[in-house]
């Protein structure tokens, strides 16, 4: 799915509003995913998945950092996320459906924290962006 210039502007503006809360929102999205889709917990057997866990916060920060990198490279997501794609496809072997579940959880988290900025257009742009990120992360599964 190609991001239009308007989509790119919406994604950059929305992520800019996330600002210093990116790691916090990443952790919240992970917690939301674990609660809403319990099967996703199977990829984290060594984590303390309780609310406020340092491990969930740490992984949330990694998710946020990857998304921040992606936002900075909207015209070259495959290049920006190549190493992460390799990791998830070849080492971690994460089922691709889980990226959609995390994307949904991220959208809900962003909507809850940015209600005045989460317009239908921004929602659509972020959804397209996260779908593109998911596509890139699963591109090396073949």
From Swiss-Prot:
<dbReference type="GO" id="GO:0005833">
    <property type="term" value="C:hemoglobin complex"/>
</dbReference>
<dbReference type="GO" id="GO:0031720">
    <property type="term" value="F:haptoglobin binding"/>
</dbReference>
<feature type="modified residue" description="Phosphoserine">
    <location>
        <position position="4"/>
    </location>
</feature>
<feature type="binding site" description="proximal binding residue">
    <location>
        <position position="88"/>
    </location>
    <ligand>
        <name>heme b</name>
    </ligand>
</feature>
<dbReference type="InterPro" id="IPR050056">
    <property type="entry name" value="Hemoglobin_oxygen_transport"/>
</dbReference>
<feature type="modified residue" description="Phosphoserine">
    <location>
        <position position="36"/>
    </location>
</feature>
<dbReference type="GO" id="GO:0005506">
    <property type="term" value="F:iron ion binding"/>
</dbReference>
<feature type="domain" description="Globin">
    <location>
        <begin position="2"/>
        <end position="142"/>
    </location>
</feature>
<feature type="binding site">
    <location>
        <position position="59"/>
    </location>
    <ligand>
        <name>O2</name>
    </ligand>
</feature>
<feature type="modified residue" description="Phosphotyrosine">
    <location>
        <position position="25"/>
    </location>
</feature>
<dbReference type="GO" id="GO:0005344">
    <property type="term" value="F:oxygen carrier activity"/>
</dbReference>
<dbReference type="GO" id="GO:0020037">
    <property type="term" value="F:heme binding"/>
</dbReference>
<keyword id="KW-0479">Metal-binding</keyword>
<feature type="modified residue" description="Phosphoserine">
    <location>
        <position position="139"/>
    </location>
</feature>
<comment type="subunit">
    <text>Heterotetramer of two alpha chains and two beta chains.</text>
</comment>
<dbReference type="GO" id="GO:0072562">
    <property type="term" value="C:blood microparticle"/>
</dbReference>
<feature type="modified residue" description="N6-succinyllysine">
    <location>
        <position position="12"/>
    </location>
</feature>
<comment type="similarity">
    <text>Belongs to the globin family.</text>
</comment>
<feature type="modified residue" description="Phosphothreonine">
    <location>
        <position position="138"/>
    </location>
</feature>
<feature type="modified residue" description="N6-succinyllysine">
    <location>
        <position position="41"/>
    </location>
</feature>
<comment type="function">
    <text>Involved in oxygen transport from the lung to the various peripheral tissues.</text>
</comment>
<dbReference type="InterPro" id="IPR012292">
    <property type="entry name" value="Globin/Proto"/>
</dbReference>
<feature type="modified residue" description="Phosphoserine">
    <location>
        <position position="50"/>
    </location>
</feature>
<dbReference type="InterPro" id="IPR002338">
    <property type="entry name" value="Hemoglobin_a-typ"/>
</dbReference>
<keyword id="KW-0561">Oxygen transport</keyword>
<feature type="modified residue" description="Phosphothreonine">
    <location>
        <position position="109"/>
    </location>
</feature>
<dbReference type="InterPro" id="IPR002339">
    <property type="entry name" value="Hemoglobin_pi"/>
</dbReference>
<keyword id="KW-0813">Transport</keyword>
<feature type="modified residue" description="Phosphoserine">
    <location>
        <position position="103"/>
    </location>
</feature>
<dbReference type="GO" id="GO:0031838">
    <property type="term" value="C:haptoglobin-hemoglobin complex"/>
</dbReference>
<feature type="modified residue" description="Phosphothreonine">
    <location>
        <position position="135"/>
    </location>
</feature>
<dbReference type="GO" id="GO:0043177">
    <property type="term" value="F:organic acid binding"/>
</dbReference>
<keyword id="KW-0408">Iron</keyword>
<keyword id="KW-0349">Heme</keyword>
<feature type="modified residue" description="N6-acetyllysine; alternate">
    <location>
        <position position="17"/>
    </location>
</feature>
<keyword id="KW-0007">Acetylation</keyword>
<dbReference type="InterPro" id="IPR000971">
    <property type="entry name" value="Globin"/>
</dbReference>
<protein>
    <recommendedName>
        <fullName>Hemoglobin subunit alpha-I/II</fullName>
    </recommendedName>
</protein>
<feature type="modified residue" description="N6-succinyllysine">
    <location>
        <position position="8"/>
    </location>
</feature>
<dbReference type="GO" id="GO:0004601">
    <property type="term" value="F:peroxidase activity"/>
</dbReference>
<dbReference type="GO" id="GO:0042744">
    <property type="term" value="P:hydrogen peroxide catabolic process"/>
</dbReference>
<dbReference type="Pfam" id="PF00042">
    <property type="entry name" value="Globin"/>
</dbReference>
């Amino acid at each position: 799915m190609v991001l239009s210039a308007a989509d790119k502007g919406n994604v950059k503006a929305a992520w800019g509003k996330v600002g210093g809360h990116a790691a916090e929102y990443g952790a919240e999205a992970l917690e939301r995913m674990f609660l809403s889709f319990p099967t996703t917990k199977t990829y984290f057997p060594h984590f303390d998945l309780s609310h406020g866990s340092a491990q969930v916060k740490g992984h949330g920060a990694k998710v946020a950092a990857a998304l921040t990198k992606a936002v900075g490279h909207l015209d070259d997501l495959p290049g920006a996320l190549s190493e992460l794609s390799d990791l998830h496809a070849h080492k971690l072997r994460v089922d691709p459906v889980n990226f959609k579940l995390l994307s949904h959880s991220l959208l809900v988290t962003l909507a809850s924290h940015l209600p005045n900025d989460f317009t239908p257009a921004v929602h659509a742009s972020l959804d397209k962006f996260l779908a593109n990120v998911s596509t890139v992360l699963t591109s090396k599964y073949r």
